[in-house]
């Protein structure tokens, strides 16, 4: 792979970190991270959404190779990818927040464009029970 950022980690640690970032992005709709990590995670997230748009069995198996949780792959294929059916790339956006207080690293929010996370019935019940 050309132009790969090493992010100060060994290959296995770097790939695991990026997989976790992408998985968290699909679970929550947005994540807060450093700008360089967000740029690398964005590359992988865009590839996964493109696989989700294909929607066939081989694409689902490719996504399962990269994403750890099966329910996140289901969410990707059934909820996230259909939102971007008519969009040709540019599924994510990076919003810069400014420097982190501890070390001054530039922070940002990586989020999915035009996607609002659906609340599951279990989450709604817990919110009602708390009130």
From Swiss-Prot:
The primary gene name is: rplQ
Q: Which GO terms describe its biological process?
A: translation
- Subunit (UniProt): Part of the 50S ribosomal subunit. Contacts protein L32.
The name this protein goes by in its record: Large ribosomal subunit protein bL17
Domain of life of the source: Bacteria
Keyword list, A-Z: Ribonucleoprotein, Ribosomal protein
Family, per the entry?
Belongs to the bacterial ribosomal protein bL17 family.
Any one GO MF annotation of this record: structural constituent of ribosome
UniProt xrefs under NCBIfam families: L17
Q: Which InterPro entries match?
A: Ribosomal_bL17, Ribosomal_bL17_CS, Ribosomal_bL17_sf
What Pfam family does this protein match (any one)?
Ribosomal_L17
- Give me the Gene Ontology terms describing cellular component: cytosolic large ribosomal subunit
Keyword check for Oxidoreductase:
no
